[in-house]
Amino acid sequence: MKTKFIFVTGGVVSSIGKGLASASLGALLEARGLRVSMQKLDPYINVDPGTMSPFQHGEVFVTDDGAETDLDLGHYERYTSARLSKRSNFTTGQVYFSVIEKERRGDYLGGTVQVIPHITDEIKHKILENAKGADVAIVEVGGTVGDIESLPFLEAIRQFKADRGAGNVLYLHVTLVPYIKTAGELKTKPTQHSVKELREIGIQPDILICRCEKDLPHDMKAKIALFCNVEEKGVITSADAEHIYAVPLALHKQGLDDQVVDKLNIWTKAPDLAPWESVVEKLRNPLKGEVHIAIVGKYVNLTESYKSLAEALTHGGIANDCRVYLRYLDSEKLESEGLGGLLDDVDAILVPGGFGERGTEGKIKAIEYARTRKVPFFGICLGMQMAVVEYARNVCGLDNAFSSEFRPDCANPVIHLMEEQKGVERKGGTMRLGAYPCSLSKGTFAHRAYGSLDVSERHRHRYEFNNAFREILVSKGLVISGIYKEGDLVEIVEVADHPWFLGCQFHPEFKSKPLNPHPLFRTFIAAALEHRGKRSQA
């Protein structure tokens, strides 16, 4: 079958939910047996988000092949089986970089390089490359219609209908219908103006997904359809959902996927949504109660920084049929003000990845609490490194143990710069990135969780466990349960005399899905559930 293209745009405001809408549509089309590719186009000039502050951009999602990408790719991977790569996310910076390189090589034969056709052709080329082998390619355009940065991308996708034929391209626009509480009314004018602006560019949307607090009444749908020149059935309500994994079911109920396959002339089987129905049922009515997890981090004022992590913990709850509540604790405050009983009523503690020295001592305090009080603990990336520092200081007696990232002249650098990182000066795209194999030791927490001795996980770091201190740490009871054999790099550490204490250098949250929870999060939440049971009996 010739590949069909669905372009998803957004209007009125940013962060309106284009990523979730795209991912949910991908899930629905896969449930019909179609092969789906997913892609995000970002209009900013950065080459990628790898050097951007989490407070600016939120989480940086890492793919198997080492791309540092937009967090929406995390939604795509969680909702679909699409294998994402460096081609799945590109920016204005990458497009211009590629075009300028071609011009310098003389590829344009002395011609004047312009936005049209050269930039738009490069955008179309990147879209087509990622779509190879797919029945349907879903392409989300970042930003908001009306942004000057988005214009070349919108022009490129406008040209697709002429290039590929009307029956092979569909435009889906996600827009806002705000509820004005003082007036007690939903307002359609922002949507009308957003679509008007899109049509002025030359794109007529086929389907509108209207984000709103409550369902749109029939007369309002009819009004939007009339003013925006779409069929009334093409006006889809996306009211605020109790759980984000209920969104595919809500969109299916309104016939979104039926309309898409009809407009694109695709014959498919009826969708099998039983797995999604099971997930939503477990989220709404968990049989085994609840657990409370403390996330001790640096970026807690913007929880989007930990998007995949929060979702992976939810997946662990789905696997254990329990509800997961997250308590975000600022590690800087713990550092300056102490724990103050903040961890006394939690069922498990997690210290996530991060960069910079600020808040590290607060994380170490939380880790010591978890280790000594036998509270289930999970350390990821920097969290694993700080667990090693805590163990070195408080169990091995290495008083000045720390990471050379923060104190280059510390006496006991139990965490140090990786050998291949020495001499690296450029910041962008130079970390240890992407999937690497990890060999596990029999009988460990990790081995029991995975049920295998060989696994592959995704990384994003420059610093590692210092093997010069391996002997003393192991002699005092630290378990090295996972290594990267090729470089003899320590990937997983555990504390044996503990219900569940594990730190990993990689980011397992990037591979967790609601339909297939990651084994480490599954067993971590199981340990939290068990700990809660013991606390309630005490």
From Swiss-Prot:
The catalytic residues are 381, 507, 509
The record makes one more remark, namely: CTPSs have evolved a hybrid strategy for distinguishing between UTP and CTP. The overlapping regions of the product feedback inhibitory and substrate sites recognize a common feature in both compounds, the triphosphate moiety. To differentiate isosteric substrate and product pyrimidine rings, an additional pocket far from the expected kinase/ligase catalytic site, specifically recognizes the cytosine and ribose portions of the product inhibitor.
Kindly give the InterPro entries that the UniProt entry links to this protein: Class_I_gatase-like, CTP_synthase, CTP_synthase_N, GATASE, GATase1_CTP_Synthase, P-loop_NTPase
- Quaternary organization: Homotetramer.
Extract the PANTHER family matched here: CTP SYNTHASE, CTP SYNTHASE-RELATED
Q: Which family does it belong to?
A: Belongs to the CTP synthase family.
- Stated name of the protein: CTP synthase
Q: Which residues bind Mg(2+)?
A: 72, 140
Cite the entry's keywords alphabetically. ATP-binding, Glutamine amidotransferase, Ligase, Magnesium, Metal-binding, Nucleotide-binding, Pyrimidine biosynthesis
Protein activity control: Allosterically activated by GTP, when glutamine is the substrate; GTP has no effect on the reaction when ammonia is the substrate. The allosteric effector GTP functions by stabilizing the protein conformation that binds the tetrahedral intermediate(s) formed during glutamine hydrolysis. Inhibited by the product CTP, via allosteric rather than competitive inhibition.
What molecular functions are annotated in GO for this chain?
ATP binding; CTP synthase activity; glutaminase activity; identical protein binding; metal ion binding
- Detail which positions bind L-glutamine: 354, 382-385, 405, 462
**Keyword Electron transport listed:** no
Residues at which CTP binds: 14, 147-149, 187-192, 223
Q: Which residues bind UTP?
A: 14, 187-192, 223
Cell wall biogenesis/degradation among keywords? no
EC number per UniProt: 6.3.4.2
**Which purpose does this protein serve, as stated in its record?**
Catalyzes the ATP-dependent amination of UTP to CTP with either L-glutamine or ammonia as the source of nitrogen. Regulates intracellular CTP levels through interactions with the four ribonucleotide triphosphates.
Organism, per UniProt? Answer: Geobacter metallireducens (strain ATCC 53774 / DSM 7210 / GS-15)
Record's HAMAP family?
A: PyrG
